[in-house]
Amino acid sequence: MEKVFYVTTPIYYVNAEPHLGHAYTTVVADFLARWHRLDGYRTFFLTGTDEHGETVYRAAQAAGEDPKAFVDRVSGRFKRAWDLLGIAYDDFIRTTEERHKKVVQLVLKKVYEAGDIYYGEYEGLYCVSCERFYTEKELVEGLCPIHGRPVERRKEGNYFFRMEKYRPWLQEYIQENPDLIRPEGYRNEVLAMLAEPIGDLSISRPKSRVPWGIPLPWDENHVTYVWFDALLNYVSALDYPEGEAYRTFWPHAWHLIGKDILKPHAVFWPTMLKAAGIPMYRHLNVGGFLLGPDGRKMSKTLGNVVDPFALLEKYGRDALRYYLLREIPYGQDTPVSEEALRTRYEADLADDLGNLVQRTRAMLFRFAEGRIPEPVAGEELAEGTGLAGRLRPLVRELKFHVALEEAMAYVKALNRYINEKKPWELFKKEPEEARAVLYRVVEGLRIASILLTPAMPDKMAELRRALGLKEEVRLEEAERWGLAEPRPIPEEAPVLFPKKEAKVEAKPKEEAWIGIEDFAKVELRVAEVLAAEKHPNADRLLVLRLSLGNEERTVVSGIAKWYRPEELVGKKVVLVANLKPAKLRGIESQGMILAAQEGEALALVTVEGEVPPGAVVK
């Protein structure tokens, strides 16, 4: 039976430039599409741009442009952005295309003739940026919950879709299909929405106010509400209702979205599908927000926006793709920063993977006449053939960061193997065994390169070229040992991941004296480590349980590189006890422990003697 996979991004609204949130969702979709193609699935990957609506119309007016010229220009920027990121989509749909307009009007007519659309008046609180009405309860301090902007009170005649009619059905469907909306927290959020009336959905705007949109097929004086229009892209791109692509791919649809558009995709879209007689999608996969380095939602006003294209230019697209997939647990709000990217780049890509390839090439020339040696049994490295089987469910469960961690753990095992076997010494006494060691490392790198291809397609093709391996690969080839064929390797190969030096601007030294009253504000106390464990969502962090004598605290600390959890228990450390609590990757840290650091060396500040937990440090 043919394996089929269909993945979509949201179609991006063209009122602004592509940003890191757009890039992340699109990289995840591209990773999933590449993984499934590699695994033999017939795959279709859809992205595109959402080009109608009041916000776009206003943006075009502000730019002094015709709306069509405006959307053509901005949509082109998204296409160029995805080219820069190496996004291999199968189709890029635009809602201004005739093929999309035809499907929107067909579905509208079908739902209207079934009696599920009626004309009425609506008065409510409207956010122009969202192009949505909100209830008083949904606002945050009177502002739009997504954009934080004032809403407008509006009253006008619109056509309405009988969405409330389908609420009981949707409630039951979600309860009977527990993996429909993922991760589970978002499923629970949607069920909470559906626990009370959701009302009917306004699906039109008067053409006199918003002329930029798809006209209703029965009333030319109204254009289609942007969400009713945009959501239908997922089937219009498949040539709904008669297209072969629709019949093949729609039953296997995975939507990827950000949590800010959960309600339209989890409530509006399913009820629209039900009313139109279209089967439900397979999965709705909801991503969290990308936060600035300060842990707050990115905002130009706060000055904490990370520019993906500046990072791409500096580190290369595959490094950026790897960082986003490896660092961010899908569905969670996660801080991103250039510093974190640089750390991940240097540790995983330059030091572990890139350096291993360079060392292996050098030893092949030195000890194997510049050739891949004859195949040999894999010994412990043959365990790598089981990795693909372990990674498949992780990818299907959206645990990309864990899948990549496992793949890179194998690369680390290859490094350990070559260091332990020391082929440079072995060659003096047992040259054949030295060549066998090198074959095993080359074969291990072949397996690792296949597993890492969906994340870093260009660099993994480069890796295979550098080692004389065939470039075209399939996932099943990572499940077999001994496929690296004896052959010469290229004499020249670029460094896969050159070291990146952090640029530090020289600043004039300034005196920064503080008074005793400033220092007195910091409350330092002795704390005893009762327990320590690895952070479930970050391999650089440890979670410590500390005793201050009369109370216990949880502290998250970035010391996992230097300390194992078990060696911390019983130590007396110095805690900044009056630091405001902060969430670090989902766990609240109630203070900070002190450490001294110089370069790569780090040591905790500890207290000797009989000083009890809770004692003040002066």
From Swiss-Prot:
Cofactor: Zn(2+)
Subcellular location: Cytoplasm
A single MF term (Gene Ontology): metal ion binding
Gene Ontology cellular component terms for the protein in this record: cytoplasm
Cofactor note: Binds 1 zinc ion per subunit.
Motif window: 'KMSKS' region: 297-301
Reaction catalysed by this enzyme: tRNA(Met) + L-methionine + ATP = L-methionyl-tRNA(Met) + AMP + diphosphate
tRNA-binding domain segment(s): 518-618
Sites where the protein binds Zn(2+): 127, 130, 144, 147
EC number in record: 6.1.1.10
Keywords annotated in UniProt: Aminoacyl-tRNA synthetase, ATP-binding, Cytoplasm, Ligase, Metal-binding, Nucleotide-binding, Protein biosynthesis, RNA-binding, tRNA-binding, Zinc
Motif 'HIGH' region location, chain numbering: 12-22
Binding of ATP, residues: 300
Nucleotidyltransferase in keyword set: no
Coiled coil: none
GO BP field: methionyl-tRNA aminoacylation
Role according to the record: Is required not only for elongation of protein synthesis but also for the initiation of all mRNA translation through initiator tRNA(fMet) aminoacylation.
HAMAP family tied to this protein: Met_tRNA_synth_type2
Subunit description: Homodimer.
Family label: Belongs to the class-I aminoacyl-tRNA synthetase family. MetG type 2A subfamily.
Protein name stated in the entry: Methionine--tRNA ligase
Native source organism of the sequence: Thermus thermophilus (strain ATCC 27634 / DSM 579 / HB8)
Taxonomic lineage: Bacteria, Thermotogati, Deinococcota, Deinococci, Thermales
Gene designation per UniProt: metG
